[in-house]
Amino acid sequence: MTQTLSQLENRGAFIERHIGPDAAQQQEMLNAVGAESLNALTGQIVPKDIQLATPPQVGEAATEYAALAELKAIAGRNKRFTSYIGMGYTAVQLPPVILRNMLENPGWYTAYTPYQPEVSQGRLEALLNFQQVTLDLTGLDMASASLLDEATAAAEAMAMAKRVSKLKNANRFFVASDVHPQTLDVVRTRAETFGFDVIVDDAAKALDHQDVFGVLLQQVGTTGEIHDYSALITELKSRKVVVSVAADFMALVLLTAPGKQGADIVFGSAQRFGVPMGYGGPHAAFFAAKDEFKRSMPGRIIGVSKDAAGNTALRMAMQTREQHIRREKANSNICTSQVLLANIASLYAVYHGPVGLKRIANRIHRLTDILAAGLQQKGLKLRHAHYFDTLCVEVADKAAVLARAEAAEINLRSDIHNAVGITLDETTTRENVAQLFNVLLGDSHGLNIETLDKDVALDSRSIQQSMLRDDAILTHPVFNRYHSETEMMRYMHSLERKDLALNQAMIPLGSCTMKLNAAAEMIPITWPEFAELHPFCPPEQAEGYHQMISQLSDWLVKLTGYDAVCMQPNSGAQGEYAGLLAIRHYHESRNEGHRDICLIPASAHGTNPASAHMAGMQVVVVACDKNGNIDLDDLRAKAEQHAANLSCIMVTYPSTHGVYEETIREVCEVVHQFGGQVYLDGANMNAQVGITSPGFIGADVSHLNLHKTFCIPHGGGGPGMGPIGVKAHLAPFVPGHSVVQIEGMLTRQGAVSAAPFGSASILPISWMYIRMMGAEGLKQASQVAILNANYIASRLKDAYPVLYTGRDGRVAHECILDIRPLKEETGISELDIAKRLIDYGFHAPTMSFPVAGTLMVEPTESEGKAELDRFIDAMLAIRAEIDQVKAGVWPLEDNPLVNAPHIQSELVAEWAHPYSREVAVFPAGVADKYWPTVKRLDDVYGDRNLFCSCVPISDYQ
């Protein structure tokens, strides 16, 4: 039969690239699960009353090439002016060796958060290096492996200061008036929900206020002034006030460490260590504190431990501080951080080393000195005598200066009264400085760069002597070894080989949606048109961004059934927080601010109660019935009991138990009946898109994990994006921004992230995904995700009971395998199975969530039948191994499961086990064998002997 031109054009070609099983394989799996078609399977599983009659109208699919061309044209509407705005964001030079071998490498960007350390040693080492950079530059004892951005790190510092403060009755937090405005914005938002009183004043007046538990200072103020706060910090410490200092990574290369001056907490952005501005993100924040406060720190901390053979190995330390364990009592709601960006910054430091970093920092400072000397020579006044890279220049005719700057395609900071701000960076050249002279002085200034250089080289006093660093930094060999590109390339590859990412195998983590991050989706994030924009540039220079964000928002509105979307939250946990704040402010607008009870099912993800606590709410747990569903009687009873104070319910759909609850609409109705709002967690949106929607179900607000459902890669633990969709009545209460208030922003509420659109530069990934899939492709993706999960459940249910199912024994897009009966019968645990899967070449499913003693499997639609079968075969083979233990063939204390994973060196070591070396290391054959580099980690040793900085190189070898 002759094909039409439309068929030959094959505009939906990407759908077949994204979805793993082809039509024939889908039919095989449908036959295996007893369904005629995808639509029939969906009809059996999803409650009839929430099924959409037609998919949301987000357009037809486009080819990869057509979508890239369309987005390139949109990106071309952005104007790339040279930015001197500063305010915590500068242009950078990302070394090409890091760009190509990390940022553009799926071996790095498709990995997951390193909960399974045996398959994560490479990125754990890179993160440990990041912590070492932070420790050296801040002068403190303990550092985390990144937070979301500088402003949220400031909010975390405030919360931590209150936790550790000995002044238990103090409720005031002092912020120096020259912190970045976006930092103050986010701090105020967080303080409101905690009930803290924020005082903003000149730092010198910090001692004038009583009942202050913490103080926030900025070492280099937002307009450039270097502050020597040593005396102030000493006095504050004598009053038992917790002192936090915001600092700049590049400035710290030359400036004295705040920790040496007595600061308790030091934080800031690592953006200028090689990470593009990206119109606001993603960027990693660094965070450090004194050792005595380590158990109160927020975020991931990488620690050095031992494996079962006694070898040095790395792991995430002190996880009992975190939301997935402590829930509403956690130090923070942080789940996703910024691992990929922290690793870029880490490797930037490795590549340049201390000598290279000092050269870069000194060059930036020298150019700033030259600029300052020339301007002063011509009669212009500088507001500050002490500076690193930023000048605050008083100008008589500010409008004329800004007009000349615009004509020269230059952005200066313009929000300072009767002055302009100018921040230089590592991309600044002497030609740029000459151009700045022209802008500020006119063309006839007659200044000579070489002459000015000689003058300032002989007599630079712009950094006060007391603030010059006098100690060595980055002395560890890792920062002094890999300075040629060949060495750096090999070092990065050696780290990558230690890890297991999607470029090697399926990562079947339940509740994580480890789907394909297609190359075509990733390409635009490094386009200069997207990568090089400052988040506070004039809006007319970011028209391409605004068009792309507007289109993406419109698509997400249609896909969610909501009325508006806010793009600011830069992680799922931040989205939860922002959504709950919208609910809180909505109630306050109706004079019902007393509503503070948040109902949360017992099965909820740990971020839910942690976010509710952070939003100033009290958590009341709702029971689940024996089938894993929300117990409607318990829900109704608690909603009625707390009717006067009911704020909301946080519910996940499909549930965290992996089923579509039949009564979800009734859940919404009960909560609404008693005056509450419905927060539907978007973690499992991959089983909704095109089939149903939160708005159609009856929810009021949801966050969307763009790093799950909409293809932003997990990056080994970040970046993420968590925009929120809201019904119209909540739209006025989503986050706003104090710096960028452009037309079309929905609100004037406080910010939850440093930048107005969060991590804007990764939004093109989700734009590309939706554009290439189209309405039908998105629905098919959800349906195949459901098919793949049911295929696994169907084939494994006789070996491992499936804990929860819905109608007709079906699951949603994930399934929970119950290991508890096997453990009781044989002594083999879910942990043993998880570690044995490594020997078979797989990352483990999610362990003991949402039910202890289980494994939750989510295959996603991107995995083909061959990979699903490989996983199923591995799980069945492991079940056979468990039977060998049960039969007494292998003793419980010495078998392939409890000794897993096995490493290469065991092949040539003395062998005393009752099973063969071949069974140990080649259970699935020799082809494409993944080799872990460490054996099972000793978690207890790691936390009892906490060590969170770089170890000797010999320990890695």
From Swiss-Prot:
Instruction: Give the protein's cofactors.
Output: pyridoxal 5'-phosphate
> What positions are modified (N6-(pyridoxal phosphate)lysine)?
708
Q: What is its EC number?
A: 1.4.4.2
Q: Catalytic activity annotated for this protein?
A: N(6)-[(R)-lipoyl]-L-lysyl-[glycine-cleavage complex H protein] + glycine + H(+) = N(6)-[(R)-S(8)-aminomethyldihydrolipoyl]-L-lysyl-[glycine-cleavage complex H protein] + CO2
InterPro entries for the chain: GcvP, GDC-P_C, GDC-P_N, GDC_P, PyrdxlP-dep_Trfase, PyrdxlP-dep_Trfase_major, PyrdxlP-dep_Trfase_small
GO cellular component terms, A-Z:
cytosol; glycine cleavage complex
**Gene Ontology BP terms:** glycine decarboxylation via glycine cleavage system
Molecular-function GO terms, alphabetical: glycine binding; glycine dehydrogenase (decarboxylating) activity; pyridoxal phosphate binding
Q: Of which family is this protein a member?
A: Belongs to the GcvP family.
Summarize the subunit comment. The glycine cleavage system is composed of four proteins: P, T, L and H.
Q: What's this protein's function?
A: The glycine cleavage system catalyzes the degradation of glycine. The P protein binds the alpha-amino group of glycine through its pyridoxal phosphate cofactor; CO(2) is released and the remaining methylamine moiety is then transferred to the lipoamide cofactor of the H protein.
Q: What is this protein called?
A: Glycine dehydrogenase (decarboxylating)
Q: Which organism is it from?
A: Salmonella typhimurium (strain LT2 / SGSC1412 / ATCC 700720)
The beginning of the lineage is: Bacteria, Pseudomonadati, Pseudomonadota, Gammaproteobacteria, Enterobacterales
